[in-house]
Amino acid sequence: MAALLVRGCALRPSWATRSAPICARGEGMKGNFAESVCLGCTSLRLLNYRNACFRSCTAARPVYVASRKGDNEFLWTDISERRYYKYLSSPASWTALKMGPWDLSVRNLHLSRPLFDDSVVEKSLKSLKDKNKKLEEGGPVYSPVSEVETVKKSLGQKVIDEIKHYYHGFRLLWIDTKIAARMLRQILNGHAMSRRERRQFLRICADLFRLVPFLVFVIVPFMEFLLPVALKLFPNMLPSTFETFSKKEERLKKELRVKLELAKFLQDTIEEIALRNKAAKGDVTAEFATFFQKIRSTGERPSNEEIVRFSKLFEDELTLDNLTRPQLVALCKLLELQSIGTNNFLRFQLTMKLRSIKADDKLIADEGLDSLTVTELQAACRARGMRALGVTEDRLKEQLKQWLELHLDQEIPTSLLLLSRALYLPDTLSPADQLKTTLQTLPESVAKEAQVKVAAVECEKVDNKTKLEATLQEEEAIRKENQEKEMERLADAAKESQQVAAKVDVQSAPEEAISGEMKTATADTAAEPAVAQMSASEQAEILKDTAPVLEGIKGEEITKEEIDILSDACTKLKEQKKLLTKEKEELSELKDDVQEYSEDLQEIKKELSKTGQEKVLQETKASKILTKRVNRMIGQMDKIISELENEEKVLDEHIEKGSVPPVGENLVSINELISIMRHIQKIPEQKLQRIAAALDENKDGKIDLDDVAKVVELIDKEDIDISTSQVAEIMELLQKEEKLAEKEKAKEKVEKEQAAEAQN
């Protein structure tokens, strides 16, 4: 930890990477955001911010309306008309403002998994292939664990262990049920959920289906059957600002949206509970516990094989979510990112940077190290926290080659590799020793999460006590995050109130100036002798602030409110153009996930057949039932999309020709986007131009609505203020990742075709 603190204080000169950095160097960032996301990785948050100009009432945020209770609160009235209150100084001074559903909208329901994330089934398949590969090479699958004499338990001890097992199991079931009910209530009320909450909700649903498999037969059909009723009773689940020509079209779009998100969430749940190992005895979890104990307590050095094997479990998201603030600051300084701000803000920067490094690593591996110039090698090494100046070209290539081997070949997470650099470890240490030292600095909270993860990957059971501890630990982290967000919100509200009060004082100043002019003159006259009596030294001690006031990047900054306006603008443009491209794309991705899941199961059976264990690992009954349900929902959604397209064709015949853009046209001009945003809320013209220019990457005056939606989702996920240059960099990163994903899909397709030809 001391090394991390020293590293965090080190000052580094600015540098330029080969690819555009995610957070611009030298640009100030507020860092005052709350990590407010919905159930999914990203979410279009359709929220309009309205300034109420009554007395000193400031901007009210509808997202807090339905969640806060107590004396000082915002309130909803009914569906057709909404009323909210802004607390001023006492309940007697509350000011009310009425708004209809056309003014206020809510966040979109979203339950899908983050992009570019391997499922548990895919990780299990990789682990199985790794084992078989080592067996074929003739080496041991894993390092032998130190043998411990098995002590035969007495009958009384067996009874006590069984009682403890069921006690922790029922307690876990009760806590999971409470948490699931609370989160489901938040979803129905239209509230967004953080990444941590979404991950917790997914794991809890998987645990509930494991503990009580009968729930699959009851909950899923019942939930699907009641979707129309839920949309009627809880309109805040989806935005109510559809500009449709038909009530039927609006109903179908809402039904499609909810079915799509539910199907994606069920598919994620399937992959969590897919496989069960009948012969599992908990050996892997015991090995991990022994490994972590060696590192943290005994000081005994594990084997290199164990270090590399278990280091893969500490994924970037898991590691960043559990790092302390000094460690987050040290990583930001190492990567020369903004190191001032909340923990969530620092995590967002690091997440974007790690994604950028991962994409660059794949590009460098494809192009080869020899294709890089010396300047590019220096920039690449420096971007990864390695020495870049005063080093020969061969040394630069060697450093980068070792990084690529650890990251891409051995699949060591980028966060661990960067943490090892932040510790200023000697270059003479081997990569395994560097990883060992890095794992020693990780908080204890990571161990429980990693232990649950290793059991899921190896398809083994985790004892109920460990699951319960991990669940309670995650709940405590969620509670702390919510407290941070609430404190930040109160600080922002207090700042706004002070600004409003200052404006009121400025307006009332001229009235008091005349009456106080004579008093001021008299006071100044009386004070002149006292000032004259002050010595020269006393006058010299009076401090005067002569520094100029810096405006920073205020003109270039996009606030959270403007991100919401941009989100609304994208939605309205899509409604005007009658686009279903986003829904079609997500449905296509869901079909691909289902197909990949089926192919992974077949590959797992094939790998198990090599060792004669194909009957040991089986698909659970719950996952089979859910798979059938998801396939059925996919068929229903295909019918809804066809019905919507037919409805739009009929409606277009009754509308004047040329008034509606052609269906499927996904490009809009910059002027269209600016016009819609100007209509939603007044924003300075120059700022509108800069926002639109940041979204127009190729500078042709056209913007792809789907690309804009993806950028907005990613930014809105963290609820931050961000500069226009950073928006452009995020768009570039997303497009780079999409190109890499297309290359990987094409490569996999070719490999499958070659394998099929070889079999024939």
Swiss-Prot record:
Gene3D superfamilies: EF-hand
Key words, A-Z: Antiport, Calcium, Calcium transport, Coiled coil, Ion transport, Membrane, Metal-binding, Mitochondrion, Mitochondrion inner membrane, Potassium, Potassium transport, Transit peptide, Transmembrane, Transmembrane helix, Transport
InterPro entries named among the record's database cross-references: EF-hand-dom_pair, EF_Hand_1_Ca_BS, EF_hand_dom, LETM1-like_RBD, LETM1/MDM38-like
Binding of Ca(2+), residues: D696, N698, D700, K702, D707
Ranges for domain Letm1 RBD: 254-555
Stretches assigned to the Mitochondrial intermembrane side: 118-210
Molecular function in Gene Ontology: calcium ion binding; calcium:proton antiporter activity; ribosome binding
Keyword Transmembrane helix: yes
Transit peptide residues according to the UniProt entry: 1-117
Stretches in topological domain Mitochondrial matrix: 232-760
GO cellular component: mitochondrial inner membrane
SUPFAM superfamilies attached to this UniProt entry: EF-hand (SSF47473)
Cellular compartments annotated: Mitochondrion inner membrane
Subunit structure: Homohexamer.
Stated name of the protein: Mitochondrial proton/calcium exchanger protein
